[in-house]
Amino acid sequence: MALRFPRFSQGLAQDPTTRRIWFGIATAHDFESHDDITEERLYQNIFASHFGQLAIIFLWTSGNLFHVAWQGNFESWVQDPLHVRPIAHTIWDPHFGQPAVEAFTRGGALGPVNIAYSGVYQWWYTIGLRTNEDLYTGALFLLFISAISLVGGWLHLQPKWKPSVSWFKNAESRLNHHLSGLFGVSSLAWAGHLVHVAIPGSRGEYVRWNNFLDVLPYPQGLGPLFTGQWNLYAQNPDSSSHLFGTSQGAGTAILTLLGGFHPQTQSLWLTDIAHHHLAIAFIFLVAGHMYRTNFGIGHSIKDLLEAHIPPGGRLGRGHKGLYDTINNSIHFQLGLALASLGVITSLVAQHMYSLPAYAFIAQDFTTQAALYTHHQYIAGFIMTGAFAHGAIFFIRDYNPQQNEDNVLARMLDHKEAIISHLSWASLFLGFHTLGLYVHNDVMLAFGTPEKQILIEPIFAQWIQSAHGKTSYGFDVLLSSTNGPAFNAGQSLWLPGWLNAINENRNSLFLTIGPGDFLVHHAIALGLHTTTLILVKGALDARGSKLMPDKKDFGYSFPCDGPGRGGTCDISAWDAFYLAVFWMLNTIGWVTFYWHWKHITLWQGNVSQFNESSTYLMGWLRDYLWLNSSQLINGYNPFGMNSLSVWAWMFLFGHLVWATGFMFLISWRGYWQELIETLAWAHERTPLANLIRWRDKPVALSIVQARLVGLAHFSVGYIFTYAAFLIASTSGKFG
């Protein structure tokens, strides 16, 4: 018999039903469950797949560069970044009639094009790229790196080049390599690029390989470095009248601590950014030499963890046993990595708009909105994944004997207290926030807006004041003009910071009021509820009072039959499944808030947000309904316009989202009966019955149907909001 899919599971390959296909796809990446898997092969497969991942990333970025160079308008955008619309690529569509061709021909293009809302133009411009040739060179280089990555992945699966398990479990060497080799060296290289190419580029000096060694980024070269006069590198920074990309108003400094933004580009000073990367490089290069490898000096992670026993016995045996637990569990390591990456991605979202690093990106409002929303959604998925793999760790890898009375065991011992406290916090936030919104809503409906309960966020305003925001009149710390910190800030450190906080042309420390207070608590409710579901799923993954032997059933199981009464929907997978809905819900509130506040800020009618955000109808009418007008105007009696594609995507997103409910609010028997009826009809229909299939069609399992439903719900939800966001923002601001 020929080998059937899936080859990694002979048991599944012999399944006579369509379950073979779906279960095969579902477990393709669960290497641990495959036939003939060994620990060594498991590590090697994962290691090789990392190279494939890198190859895809480099190919994708290469494609961005290539298509902009080939079909974009980078060179004309560089001449006038504020008024030329950046083109991502052309659109070739045989269905386009003349109105469509006219609607999508913009940005100085000859035919229909897509506008870039990803910020790549601003990024490439800031780092010193100026011509299409530069973009082609970058694309070719990344293509080369992509090919090298593929070869690397293949190579590390060959017998001679397969690393051993001990190599994968050498934590100290890996830490040193990642800290120094990846973070340290790459940050140093980036600081070097900024100093040698980007900063001269911002001052009108075009540095390439042919003149790289002739152009000194600083007049005195390395002199100040070797004579210890490092402060010279910060002297004579660009002036406030500097025109980016020209020598007009340019200085000579390369490493500064100015703070604030370049007045023309409204982005961080390039010299500040270079300084930051140099500092990061220094820290990580040092950190990468701290762990004990060949020479018997430095820290041993195991020794560090074994020594971490808090005095007073409050945390039992502290970190004892953690080293082997973490080092031998890929799921634990992945959970930690995902948790860190998720937090970082959310921080990227917050900082890309409040402290924009790329020239002119702050004035490209649609790009700002798209990047914020994109990074928050990515962060949500990554963070929920962290808890999913934490739960799998508890089911597959956790050994109670190895972890007796350490912090992990104590988390499990205290899980009732942890879960009930989170539950209490969620209930408190939910009822109080909704209560305030509903009360205010009713007051507005009855025509007595003055009876709303409006709470000023005085503590948050005080924190903003402490950082230098003067408009609240708190007169504290950095907002107190006669305090020592304020005076030192004028000259010693970040003199531009206080100006930036107090001018209205950026998104630093936006003025907040009762509407912000309410929506912050709504978001807090979402965060706490999502966390509650995820934490409970992980802590109850091994067992609960209702089902003490849960771990024997694995990560995802539908029920344990009627005999156990009520064991449905309590697998760790079900907790993840439920949490994703809450995560999407929460990020919906976060992005609604961010977008509405910024739209009113950019349009100069902040009072609309302030007045309408304190009650539910305000959000529904003045944010969602008012801003969706562009989406229902994509096609009208006058034909179509450049928003038509978003209008179509808005409808399509709703369709995909609604399809999700077909899988979510349904039972397996219904589908099985329907499938059998269809199969019966098929087999009795002339011509149709000439086509036979090998596998008996069966309905999806309960867990699979939930996954399919969740996938449609998530994709439709994000498509719908993406279309709304881009159309409503670009419709107003271009």
UniProtKB/Swiss-Prot annotation:
Reactions mediated catalytically: reduced [plastocyanin] + hnu + oxidized [2Fe-2S]-[ferredoxin] = oxidized [plastocyanin] + reduced [2Fe-2S]-[ferredoxin]
UniProt-listed PROSITE patterns: PHOTOSYSTEM_I_PSAAB
GO terms, molecular function: 4 iron, 4 sulfur cluster binding; chlorophyll binding; electron transfer activity; magnesium ion binding; oxidoreductase activity
Subcellular location: Plastid, Chloroplast thylakoid membrane
One Pfam family hit: PsaA_PsaB
GO CC entries: chloroplast thylakoid membrane; photosystem I
Signal peptide: none
Gene3D superfamilies listed in its UniProt record: Photosystem I PsaA/PsaB (1.20.1130.10)
Protein residues bound to phylloquinone: W671
E.C. no: 1.97.1.12
Parts of the chain that traverse the membrane: 46-69, 135-158, 175-199, 273-291, 330-353, 369-395, 417-439, 517-535, 575-596, 643-665, 707-727
Residues binding chlorophyll a B1: H654
UniProt binding sites for [4Fe-4S] cluster: C559, C568
Main location: plastid
Subunit structure: The PsaA/B heterodimer binds the P700 chlorophyll special pair and subsequent electron acceptors. PSI consists of a core antenna complex that captures photons, and an electron transfer chain that converts photonic excitation into a charge separation. The eukaryotic PSI reaction center is composed of at least 11 subunits.
Family membership: Belongs to the PsaA/PsaB family.
Function recorded in the entry: PsaA and PsaB bind P700, the primary electron donor of photosystem I (PSI), as well as the electron acceptors A0, A1 and FX. PSI is a plastocyanin-ferredoxin oxidoreductase, converting photonic excitation into a charge separation, which transfers an electron from the donor P700 chlorophyll pair to the spectroscopically characterized acceptors A0, A1, FX, FA and FB in turn. Oxidized P700 is reduced on the lumenal side of the thylakoid membrane by plastocyanin.
Entry-linked PANTHER family: OUTER MEMBRANE PROTEIN, OMPA-RELATED, PHOTOSYSTEM I P700 CHLOROPHYLL A APOPROTEIN A1-RELATED
Protein name: Photosystem I P700 chlorophyll a apoprotein A2
Source organism: Nymphaea alba (White water-lily)
